[in-house]
Amino acid sequence: MTRIKRGYIARRRRKKISLFASSFRGAHSRLTRTITQQRIRALVSAHRDRDRKKRDFRRLWITRINAVIRGVGVSYSYSRLIHNLYKKQLLLNRKILAQIAISNRNCLYMISNEIRK
């Protein structure tokens, strides 16, 4: 069998994955086999958390709106506010409502009073 000279292909491949894992701690940034395993884990987590981030931000916006809107009245809540928004066909999404709730509560109170009529 003839000899195959691959040059620096393997070194280049290992260097590429070690650059990816250079910020990892311990053997996760030094040993090739553990680097590849941790790289797969990191990419899986990143893929999973891209969807989870959307979920978490939606929950945060809903919590912020609900916390502010409960100050309007005892029986008034987030779900009633959203229901009234849909009935009046106001196109305000949860992100915008949460920003209004944080920056200008009086504006959110005015919106809720207008749509309750």
From Swiss-Prot:
Keywords: Chloroplast, Plastid, Ribonucleoprotein, Ribosomal protein, RNA-binding, rRNA-binding
Membrane-spanning residues: none
One BP annotation, GO: translation
CDD domains with a match to the protein in the record: Ribosomal_L20
Subcellular location as annotated: Plastid, Chloroplast
Major location category of this protein: plastid
Keyword hit for RNA-binding: yes
Name of one Pfam family that matches: Ribosomal_L20
GO molecular function, one term: rRNA binding
One GO term describing the cellular component: chloroplast
HAMAP family: Ribosomal_bL20
Family: Belongs to the bacterial ribosomal protein bL20 family.
Function: Binds directly to 23S ribosomal RNA and is necessary for the in vitro assembly process of the 50S ribosomal subunit. It is not involved in the protein synthesizing functions of that subunit.
Protein name: Large ribosomal subunit protein bL20c
